[in-house]
Amino acid sequence: MLSLALPLTGMKLVSSLMRTVQSALIPARLQISGLPASEALSRFGMLSGMLMPVLMLPSFITCSLCMVAAPELTRRQANGTPQRSLVRRILGGTLLVGLCAMVGVWLFAPLIADTLYRQAELLPLLRRCCVLVPVMALSQVVSGLMNGLGLQGTSLRIALFANLLSVLLMYALAAQPTLQLWGAVIAMAAAQAVTLALSLRALYAAVR
């Protein structure tokens, strides 16, 4: 039991530490790019408080999928029943939810940016970053399925690698005057893509 709990605790610690690092690193690097301190903090607030919550909208559905699917996957693993077909159905459903949410973000981006948040600069962020919605949804579900198969240690190693990559890219890119906040977005997107790719590889290697 402890061997399962420790990696999960580690992942929560990594997530918390990453938020702390981002809250200090991104504004500091944006200032180096030439933005005043107040503007750098405002841009970071737009990223963390406006963009990210919208991109994570499907999480209330994907969390439910994880809660239902993970125990069934564990049961099939214990019984020696093939799991790959179940994994395909779950990921297919998740992808459909993510794609629908992506289209929704694209269509309603002007309403979200101009009416809800009253931030015109948020519109291009939403439009360009909406492709991350299905990636983030899939990452969340794949992580839940891996936990159901007892792959918490693998999930932790992937999270550590992806977060380290994200920090390094943010440090390098967010300070570029031609990128600024887009540098942080690129770093975040790269980390999400790497997380999904490595997690899918580990998941399919574990199921049959």
Language-model-detected regions and their locations in the chain:
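Helix-loop junctions and terminal segments of transmembrane helices
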Residues: L55-N79
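C-terminal transmembrane helix end/exit motif
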Residues: S23, A189-R208
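Membrane-interface junctions at transmembrane-helix termini in multi-pass inner-membrane proteins
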Residues: V133-F161
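Helix-terminus/linker motif at the lipid-water interface of multi-pass membrane proteins
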Residues: L13-L57, A113-T115
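Short membrane-interface helical motifs at transmembrane helix boundaries
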Residues: C100-P124
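Junctions where cytoplasmic loops transition into the N-terminal start of transmembrane alpha-helices
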Residues: L4, L8-M11, F44-L51, S85-G98
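Membrane-interface helix-loop junctions in multi-pass transport and translocation proteins
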Residues: G150-G153, N163-A197
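Interhelical loop/hinge segments that connect adjacent transmembrane helices in multipass membrane
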Residues: M1-S15, A205-R208
